Curated annotation (Swiss-Prot):
Residues 32-603 are lumenal. Disulfide bonds join C135-C365, C356-C432, C471-C488, C523-C538, C563-C578. It comes from Mus musculus. One of its GO terms (molecular function) is polypeptide N-acetylgalactosaminyltransferase activity. This is Polypeptide N-acetylgalactosaminyltransferase 10.
Length: 603
């Protein structure tokens, strides 16, 4: 009897072994059939180890979390110690000491950032660990999915592209990186051809794909994702620097819920001197206004965690830096292939994931630096329109809320969005929720900062100085430039009137160029009781941009405790000690709403 039981157990064991091994033999055979020919910069034989690694990882990984799942400290302590000892230009994220000769426009012309400075900084430079201190002690799942890291580029600078790759290789556990896929969007610079292929041949995990024509950022990302082999696809831009232990916190969240899209905190690499620092406000939720400009808003108290280093929900991603389960990405349809070049794709993927059964989080313990260009250095092909992309997203995903966009951008109303039938069918097939659900359940805090229907303005029109008879003017007003006084031009031509001397004292208690329905995105800003009044990005956080229009016609600035003043001789506008009897501190708005002003001044 015992002999029969033993034979029975052996038979069961063999059957179980066959169930485990045979599917993986089939997977290996399928891989061998689909393996592309080796070519310079291509996949070739170098990918075989990654494929074997993927095979083994699929044998041992199921990602059904249970009590047996162990946690691990993924920090590379030795690499962190080495980085701490590095000195030199740009090390520890410090600014490069620029000379006047290095600030010339030629340094920025090809890349939108100072390539001269970039070339003088090490490809392996160290970065400051600016994570919350709690991140140092966080543990993540011992068994994590691996990832294909997709980096699209078009005519990228040599050192900035290579530094992106080096930072990923230096600060990522190698067992978690299935591959790094560089996708060249039809670059024509010589250093991105054979020199790049020769250089990247030194790194077996890196391969290069090339488009046959200019496809744009969106389709180039799609090409990279379609060629990816990892469990997860992680998208980065081509001028980034990954910071310490950036990857495990992202993959951990996906391992726990495969329908979660995760975004690192995006730090700022200065386009001039390459200093590395956090964004203003650091951890904030992604949002948008009703002209479809990306915005960041504070995390509301209801969503704040006891541990500020924990992941938090975000309605909208910033753009090109995120990780997503590869299969889930394709279940969602990837990016809409009808979107051209760049722009609007972050809204499309954000709305789609939330409305169609997934979620999106920002991960404070994962940080990646990004160079925000001084300007876009390349030309967009003729006929390509950001407005068309935004209209396409609005038509497919935003339901009746699209009307709020058209009210602010009436030119969008009759713009063709192309054929959206397939995208609307996809939305139905995925059983996606309504945009009203998104606005009430996910982005419920957005209307507090960017209401679909703007509350009435407190004042608008020209702002005329009583003492000089001159008007505030933005004729020379680029971002960061001082506000000026000029001869008032009301009635001297509608185009000039609309563009230079119309201002709105908004319901946010800031002052912006433009009429109440078409305000611009920069505000009157002052930093001290003697500083000039400058035009700065509106942040809707009051502070330096909070103003009070008092009954004595002064524009009072609570932060500095001073009033807006001016000089007729040099046309300057500046802050000064308040003196209600001074005519140069008295200002007349063309139109005022007394009810709104009274409410402002009560507060």
């Amino acid at each position: 009897m015992r002999r029969k039981e033993k034979r029975l157990l052996q038979a069961v064991a063999l059957a179980l072994a066959a169930l485990v091994l045979l599917p993986n033999v089939g997977l290996w055979a399928l891989y061998r059939e689909r393996q592309p020919d080796g070519s310079p910069g291509g996949l070739g034989a170098a990918v075989a180890p990654a494929a074997v690694q993927e095979l083994h990882s699929r044998q041992k990984k199921t990602f059904f979390l249970g009590a047996e799942q162990r946690l691990k400290d993924w920090h590379n302590k030795e690499a962190i110690r080495r980085d701490a000892q590095r000195v030199g230009y740009g090390e520890q994220g410090k600014p490069y000491p620029m000379t006047d000769a290095e600030r010339v426009d030629q340094a920025y012309r090809e890349n939108g950032f100072n390539i001269y400075v970039s070339d003088k900084i090490s490809l392996n430079r160290s970065l400051p660990d600016i994570r919350h201190p709690n991140c140092n002690s966080k543990l993540y799942l011992e068994t994590l999915p691996n990832t294909s890291i997709i980096i699209p580029f078009h005519n990228e600078g040599w050192s900035s592209l290579l530094r992106t790759v080096h930072s990923v290789l230096n600060r990522s556990p190698p067992e978690l990186v299935a591959e790094i896929v560089l996708v060249d969007d039809f670059s024509d610079r010589e250093h991105l051809k054979k020199p790049l292929e020769d250089y990247m041949a030194l790194f077996p995990s890196v391969r290069i794909l090339r488009t046959k024509k200019r496809e744009g950022l969106i389709r180039t990302r799609m090409l990279g994702a379609s060629a990816a082999t990892g469990d997860v696809v992680t998208f980065l831009d081509s001028h980034c620097e990954a910071n310490v232990n950036w990857l495990p916190p992202l993959l951990d969240r996906i391992a726990r819920n495969r329908k979660t899209i995760v975004c690192p905190m995006i730090d700022v690499i200065d386009h001039d001197d390459f200093r590395y620092e956090t964004q203003a406000g650091d951890a904030m939720r992604g949002a948008f206004d009703w002209e479809m400009y990306y915005k960041r808003i504070p995390i509301p108290p209801e969503l704040q965690k006891a541990d500020p280093s924990d992941p938090f929900e975000s309605p909208v991603m910033a753009g090109g830096l995120f990780a997503v389960d590869r299969k889930w990405f394709w279940e969602l349809g990837g990016y809409d292939p009808g979107l051209e070049i760049w722009g609007g794709e972050q809204y499309e993927i954000s709305f789609k994931v939330w409305m169609c059964g997934g979620r999106m989080e920002d991960i404070p313990c994962s940080r990646v630096g990004h160079i925000y260009r001084k300007y876009v250095p390349y030309k967009v092909p003729a006929g390509v329109s950001l407005a068309r992309n935004l209209k396409r997203v609005a038509e497919v995903w935003m339901d009746e809320y699209a009307e709020y966009i058209y009210q602010r951008r009436p030119e969008y109303r009759h713009l063709s969005a192309g054929d959206v039938v397939a995208q609307k069918k996809l939305r139905v097939s995925l059983n996606c929720k309504s945009f009203k659900w998104f606005m009430t359940k996910i982005a419920w805090d957005l209307p507090k900062f960017y209401p679909p229907v703007e509350p009435p303005a407190a004042a608008w029109g020209e702002i005329r100085n009583v003492g000089t008879g001159l008007c505030t003017d933005t004729k020379l007003g680029t971002l960061g430039s001082p506000l000026r006084l000029e001869t008032c031009i009301r009635g001297r031509g509608e185009a000039a009137w609309n563009s230079m001397q119309v201002f709105t004292f908004t319901w946010r208690e800031d002052i912006r160029p433009g009429d109440p329905q078409h305000t611009k995105k920069f505000c009157f800003d002052a930093v001290s009781h003697t500083s000039p009044v400058t035009l700065y990005d509106c942040h809707s956080m009051k502070g330096n941009q909070l103003w009070k229009y008092r009954k004595d016609k002064t524009l009072y600035h609570p932060v500095s405790g001073s009033c807006m003043d001016c000089s007729e001789s040099d046309h300057r506008v500046f802050m000064n000690t308040c003196n209600p009897s001074s005519l140069t501190q008295q200002w007349l708005f063309e139109h005022t709403n007394s009810t709104v002003l009274e409410n402002f001044n009560k507060n």
